[in-house]
């Protein structure tokens, strides 16, 4: 068996013979002969693919494959750097990008080659700055025009001082707000349409504020009414609802008016361009004015942007394509944002058939006249030069200028009169200087009184109680003259009772006159109220005839519940303030009191035209009459004709509060119901007839008038006796009969001087109170028994008191002294002194006066 050697690596590498070993050469020759084909074939695989040497030892030369062995695929490893993928993408990019990068590298300085390591750091820093810029960039809401307008308006005051001129630089405002200048232009154009700013130069505006805003809005409303925008709004609203509306002719007329009517307050240089240039008509300023007009003339004050855009597109005669409509809506939305920032409109939502869509509602001023007056009152009085400048700068018409100018002058006059009243009424000295009293103080007081009493007079006139209402309210202001004041009769007559129960006429007795208080006042026709400087009460007492005493029961003008006149109890409750008013009555600058207080307006016309009666049964009336007749004292007769009554104070004397309150002096008026007295009527002045017809009321005998001594000096009483039939016609002008003329005994009077301690009587039963009249319910009749013992003292002191008061017959004085002759300061104790110091009057009549000695007659009770 032949042994062959294995093929080694040495054999593959070198094919040369080794001459040093002949044996080997023989063997190699033999091998070459044997393996001739294999000598060439192993070289071919070396070129194509390497041989796996690890397997060569197990293979024989015969077993070596001719084709190469396929190597198993392995997964590729991750890239070495994070930017390997980026580099691969850059390499795959277009050649233009690579050429651009090459050009940048060519133009870079040579030094950059040394600092290539810092390029990556700079790129990282740039990326961080970009992130910060994105965070600092404002949001869409922050860039809105409404918020930008609020920031712009916050830089300037709404009502700047007229002396300061504020200039707006658009470049400065844009840089400070961090926006482009075109955004500031949008705001300024809308503000210029409302005259809040005015253009001075390029990018320079003057700030005026909202001083003239109401006037501008009023003018815009006037122009909008001329353009008939209200009909156009209604037309488009009905069109949206699918209804037909005939407004084509109105729209044509509106377009003609619009072409002929220039908008307000355009400068002289702008007026020709406005009428000729369509570009000027489409400007944001003109569009803003028209948009505001739509709000001012609208009835609902709500406008949608669609309707506004349609009206403005038709007005500008543009092609109504969709692109123009969207442009108009965007421009109107910018205007609405600025107006919202000004507080003139607000955004609302309107629901219609198509759904919910946004709209804007007007919340700005509507009544411009009232706000103008309010603003003028709060401002200071300008100088004449500034008034002229304001009138020249005013954008209103000539008619409005004249009205505003008159109003400013009225403010000046009003302030002067206010200062004059303040100086005249200032209590700088205890006695006012001699001279005529200023009527401004009277006018101010009476104006305040008019506001209180006028609603009541109007209510009465509506109910038909006042027949002649030509003068709803009038007063009598006392002015010093050279003669006595006379009582003028009222034209219309008011019946108090029926004609069957009336036998004698009655008139009004004016208060007695003195040198210090000469204050008889005349009545004006249709005069509901009368103002008197002194507290005076007119008393009308009516009486039925003696023969009809049993047929006709007591009648009273004290109203029933529901009437406006007070009852006797209400009148008594309102008298506790009388001492204060009596003291103020003698002061020259005291507020002049009315005849009627707030609670005691017995002069209500309703209570006069309708006789309001509270009747009593004959048994109750006779019981009261017997009790009073038992305590009746004889009185002295009077024979004076045409005498007048003295002042009785401003209210009816109370009859219940006797010695209950020490601070308030006891005061009461006591009239017993004798056999001839069946009615007691009180009439407080002064809006009714002063002279009644002779067949209206019966006269009255007043046997008792009881007054305490503390109030005697301030409240004297003088009653007149019977008036003859011949003289009654001449005394009807302002005087009253208290007794029946020629048929009955003359009037009897007792004035009680001392204070009478009267115990409080028990109150009547409830069932009797309901049936009795106010005079019968009052506990006056119960006081008679306790007052009998003091009646003689009352009579003796009444004679002394009656001598203090001279003849009540008025005589014309030489000169009427003003009302401010009294001392400026008075104490409550000086009332008696002032009344006792009244000078005596000369007696002009020959008839016996009331100051004669009173005869005490026990049989004079009738």
Curated annotation (Swiss-Prot):
Localization terms from the record: Nucleus
DNA-binding region boundaries: 140-209, 279-364
Domain text: In contrast to classical members of the E2F transcription factor, atypical members contain 2 DNA-binding domains and regulate transcription in a DP-independent manner. Both DNA-binding domains are required for DNA-binding and are proposed to form an intramolecular structure that is similar to the winged helix structure of the E2F-DP heterodimer.
Protein keywords: Activator, Cell cycle, DNA-binding, Nucleus, Repressor, Transcription, Transcription regulation
Family matches, as Pfam families: E2F_TDP
InterPro entries documented for this protein: E2F (IPR015633), E2F_WHTH_DNA-bd_dom (IPR003316), WH-like_DNA-bd_sf (IPR036388), WH_DNA-bd_sf (IPR036390)
Protein name (Swiss-Prot/TrEMBL): Transcription factor E2F7
A cellular-component GO term for this protein: nucleus
Oligomeric and partner information: Homodimer and heterodimer: mainly forms homodimers and, to a lesser extent, heterodimers with e2f8.
Keyword Phosphoprotein: no
Biased composition (Polar residues): 564-574, 633-643, 832-851
Top-level taxon in the UniProt lineage: Eukaryota
GO process annotations (BP): chorionic trophoblast cell differentiation; DNA damage response, signal transduction by p53 class mediator; hepatocyte differentiation; negative regulation of cytokinesis; negative regulation of G1/S transition of mitotic cell cycle; negative regulation of transcription by RNA polymerase II; positive regulation of DNA endoreduplication; sprouting angiogenesis
Ranges of biased composition (kind: Basic and acidic residues): 575-590
One term of GO molecular function: DNA-binding transcription factor activity
Disordered: annotated span: 561-592, 617-643, 788-862
Record family assignment: Belongs to the E2F/DP family.
């Amino acid at each position: 068996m032949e042994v062959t050697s294995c093929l080694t690596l040495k054999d593959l590498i070198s094919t040369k013979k080794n001459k040093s070993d002949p044996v080997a050469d023989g063997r190699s020759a033999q091998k070459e002969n044997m393996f001739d084909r294999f000598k060439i074939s192993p070289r071919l695989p070396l070129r194509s693919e390497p041989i796996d040497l690890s397997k060569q030892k197990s293979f024989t030369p015969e077993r070596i494959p001719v084709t190469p062995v396929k190597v198993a695929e392995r997964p590729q490893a991750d890239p070495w750097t994070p930017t390997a993928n980026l580099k691969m993408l850059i390499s795959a990019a277009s050649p233009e990008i690579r050429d651009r990068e090459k050009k940048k590298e060519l133009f870079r300085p040579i030094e950059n080659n040394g600092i290539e390591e810092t390029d990556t750091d700079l790129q990282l820093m740039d990326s961080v700055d970009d992130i910060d810029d994105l965070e600092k960039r404002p949001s869409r809401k922050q860039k809105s025009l409404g918020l930008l307008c609020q920031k712009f308006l916050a830089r300037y005051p709404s009502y700047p001082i007229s002396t300061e001129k504020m200039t707006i630089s658009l470049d400065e405002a844009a840089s400070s707000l961090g926006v482009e200048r075109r955004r500031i232009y949008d705001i300024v154009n809308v503000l210029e349409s409302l005259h809040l700013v005015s253009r001075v130069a390029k990018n320079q505006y003057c700030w005026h504020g909202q001083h003239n805003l109401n006037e501008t809005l009023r003018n815009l409303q006037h122009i909008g009414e001329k353009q008939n925008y209200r009909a156009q709004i209604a037309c488009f609203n009905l069109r949206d609802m699918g209804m037909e509306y005939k407004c084509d002719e109105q729209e044509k007329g509106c377009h003609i008016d619009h072409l002929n009517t220039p908008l307000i307050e355009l400068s002289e240089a702008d007026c020709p361009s406005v009428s000729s240039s369509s570009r000027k008509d489409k400007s944001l300023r003109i569009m803003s004015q028209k948009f505001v007009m739509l709000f001012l003339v609208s009835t609902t004050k709500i406008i949608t942007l669609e309707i506004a855009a349609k009206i403005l597109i038709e007005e500008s005669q543009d092609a109504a394509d969709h692109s123009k409509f969207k442009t108009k809506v965007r421009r109107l939305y910018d205007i609405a944002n600025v107006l919202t920032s000004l507080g003139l409109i607000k955004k609302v939502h309107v629901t219609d058939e198509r759904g919910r869509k946004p709209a804007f509602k007007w919340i700005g001023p509507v009544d411009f006249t009232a706000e103008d007056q309010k603003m003028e009152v709060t401002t200071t009085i300008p100088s004449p030069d500034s008034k002229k400048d304001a009138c020249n700068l005013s954008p209103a018409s000539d008619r409005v200028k004249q009205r505003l100018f008159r109003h400013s002058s009225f403010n000046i006059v009003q302030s002067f009169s206010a200062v004059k009243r303040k100086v005249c009424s200032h209590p700088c000295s205890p006695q006012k200087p001699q001279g005529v009293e200023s009527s401004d103080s009277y006018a101010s007081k009476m104006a305040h009184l008019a506001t209180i009493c006028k609603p009541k007079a109007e209510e009465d006139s509506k109910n038909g109680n006042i027949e002649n209402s030509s003068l709803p309210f009038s007063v009598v202001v006392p002015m010093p003259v050279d003669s006595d004041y006379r009582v003028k009769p009222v034209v219309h007559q008011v019946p108090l009772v029926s004609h069957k129960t009336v036998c004698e006429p009655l008139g009004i007795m004016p208060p007695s006159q003195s040198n210090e208080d000469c204050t008889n006042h005349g009545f004006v026709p249709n005069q509901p109220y009368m103002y008197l400087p002194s507290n005076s009460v007119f008393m009308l007492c009516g009486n039925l005839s003696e023969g009809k005493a049993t047929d006709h029961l007591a009648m009273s003008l004290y109203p029933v519940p529901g009437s406006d006149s007070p009852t006797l109890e209400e009148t008594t409750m309102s008298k506790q303030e009388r001492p204060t008013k009596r003291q103020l009555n003698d002061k020259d600058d005291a507020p002049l009191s009315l005849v009627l207080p707030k609670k005691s307006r017995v002069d209500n016309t309703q209570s006069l035209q309708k006789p309001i009666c509270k009747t009593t049964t004959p048994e109750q009336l006779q019981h009261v009459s017997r009790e009073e007749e038992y305590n009746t004292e004889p009185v002295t007769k009077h024979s004076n004709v045409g005498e007048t009554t003295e002042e009785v104070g401003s209210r009816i004397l109370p009859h219940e509060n006797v010695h209950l309150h020490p601070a308030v002096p006891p005061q009461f008026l006591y009239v017993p119901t004798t056999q001839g007295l069946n009615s007691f009527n009180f009439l407080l002045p002064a809006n009714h007839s002063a002279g009644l017809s002779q067949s209206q009321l019966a006269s009255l005998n007043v046997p008792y008038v009881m007054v305490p001594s503390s109030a005697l000096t301030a409240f004297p009483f003088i009653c007149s006796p019977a008036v003859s039939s011949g003289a009654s016609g001449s005394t009807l002008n302002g005087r009253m009969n208290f007794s029946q003329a020629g048929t009955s005994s003359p009037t009897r009077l007792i004035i009680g001087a001392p204070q009478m301690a009267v115990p409080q009587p028990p109150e009547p039963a409830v069932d009797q109170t309901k049936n009795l009249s106010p005079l019968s319910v009052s506990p006056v009749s119960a006081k008679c028994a306790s007052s009998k013992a003091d009646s003689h003292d009352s009579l003796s002191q009444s004679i002394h008191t009656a001598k203090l008061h001279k003849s009540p017959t008025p005589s014309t004085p030489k000169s009427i002294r003003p009302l401010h002759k009294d001392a400026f300061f008075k104490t409550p104790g000086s009332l008696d002194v002032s009344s006792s110091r009244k000078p005596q009057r000369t007696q002009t009549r020959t008839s016996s006066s009331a100051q004669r000695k009173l005869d005490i007659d026990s049989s004079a009770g009738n």
